[in-house]
């Protein structure tokens, strides 16, 4: 039975009516880009998460997939794996540079071709190359992350999207193949202090340059290792992209120690518009997919639940940075 056949009658009626209306309003949308986190934008239907797998056959996994993301991580289900090595970041000893974009869906940082930034270790058997840093956040504090821990959300989630450079030549090819992608997620809370890396992205001089959709601003001299806590544990599972086409080729690595940004920085994020300046303001906030069933997937972690009182200490709980002057 196809995805459309399993669609409930009310949702089917809404979809068919909306598609019929869309057919009479201007040119046809690009099928590869016709999706949103909200079903209604400026009075026009744009497929939100419940409809992603129904408007494009290439996105069918968004409806029928059994390894979808994001998920709610219940810590009691996490299996301690003492053989997980520490995560390793390779920057070649160079500072990161690239372009910060307002894509209309996310705040996105696309690194320049050089230096190449790779991540390995942890659950990864291959080296993965950084392709994008993506920031998701909510309209209110504590409700902006895609993933949850013990049913608890966070104000924002930073996702570092990597592709398997040993098996694939680029992100697009890796999205279509097995063992293709690795996404590192870091959760963000609102507090009185701010993570130094995020402060570079969210200071007033920078964030006001990307107020509207398609705005872009070039940044340089970024130290990516400053994004990570000094010490941390992580939880990993097999999942999918949380945007169309929802490909089930992602190894997710969730860092279990949250970062901080200030309330002013969070407010500045919520003032970003998902539209160009010629259109009505709609906040970029609320740019996450709803939770998906974990089902029978395994959750593995490198923190020993038999000793929850112990803080993460030692080299296994630090990011190993190749090429840094003194490492971490």
From Swiss-Prot:
The Alpha-carbonic anhydrase domain covers 33-303
Q: Which domain of life is it from?
A: Eukaryota
Q: Looking at the record, which segments are called Disordered?
A: 300-328
InterPro entries per the record?
Alpha_CARP_X/XI, CA_dom, CA_dom_sf, Carbonic_anhydrase_a-class
User: Which ranges are annotated Basic and acidic residues under compositional bias?
Assistant: 319-328
Cysteine pairs bridged by disulfides in the record: none
Q: Secreted among the record's keywords?
A: yes
The glycosylation sites are 118, 170, 260
Keyword annotations for this protein? Glycoprotein, Secreted, Signal
Keyword check for Signal, yes or no: yes
Q: Where in the cell is it found?
A: Secreted
Q: Name one GO cellular component term.
A: extracellular region
Give a GO molecular function annotation for the protein: zinc ion binding
Instruction: State the SMART domains in the record.
Output: Carb_anhydrase
Q: Which residues form the signal peptide?
A: 1-22
PROSITE patterns xrefs: ALPHA_CA_2 (PS51144)
Q: Which PANTHER family match?
A: CARBONIC ANHYDRASE, CARBONIC ANHYDRASE-RELATED PROTEIN 11
Family, similarity comment: Belongs to the alpha-carbonic anhydrase family.
Q: What does this protein do?
A: Does not have a catalytic activity.
Task: Please identify the protein, giving its name as recorded.
Answer: Carbonic anhydrase-related protein 11
């Amino acid at each position: 039975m196809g995805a459309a056949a399993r669609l409930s009658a009310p949702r089917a009626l809404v979809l068919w009516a909306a598609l019929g209306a869309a057919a009479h309003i201007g040119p046809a949308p690009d099928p590869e880009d016709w999706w949103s986190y909200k079903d209604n934008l400026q009075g026009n239907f744009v497929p939100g998460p419940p409809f992603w797998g129904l408007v494009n056959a290439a996105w069918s996994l968004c409806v029928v997939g059994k390894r979808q993301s994001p998920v709610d991580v219940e810590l009691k289900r996490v299996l301690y794996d003492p053989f997980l090595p520490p995560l390793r970041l390779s920057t070649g000893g160079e500072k990161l540079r690239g372009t910060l974009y307002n894509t209309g869906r996310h705040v996105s940082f696309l690194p320049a071709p050089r230096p190449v930034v790779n991540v390995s270790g942890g659950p990864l058997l291959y080296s993965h190359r950084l392709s994008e840093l993506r920031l998701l956040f909510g309209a209110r504090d504590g409700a902006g992350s895609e993933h949850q821990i013990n049913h608890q959300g966070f104000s924002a989630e930073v996702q570092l999207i990597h592709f398997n450079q040993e098996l694939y030549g680029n992100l697009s090819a890796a999205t279509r193949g097995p063992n293709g992608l690795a996404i590192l997620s870091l959760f963000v809370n609102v507090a009185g202090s701010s993570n130094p890396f995020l402060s570079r992205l969210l200071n007033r001089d920078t964030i006001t340059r990307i107020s509207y959709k398609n705005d872009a601003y070039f940044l340089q001299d970024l130290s990516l290792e400053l994004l990570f806590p000094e010490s941390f544990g992580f939880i990993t599972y097999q999942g999918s992209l949380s945007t169309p086409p929802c490909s089930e080729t992602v190894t997710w690595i969730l860092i279990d120690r949250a970062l901080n940004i200030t309330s002013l920085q969070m407010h500045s994020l919520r003032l970003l518009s998902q539209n160009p300046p010629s259109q009505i303001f709609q906040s970029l906030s609320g740019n996450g997919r709803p939770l998906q069933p974990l089902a029978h997937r395994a959750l593995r972690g490198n923190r020993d639940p038999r000793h929850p009182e112990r803080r993460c200490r030692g080299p296994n709980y630090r990011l190993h940075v190749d090429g840094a002057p003194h490492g971490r």
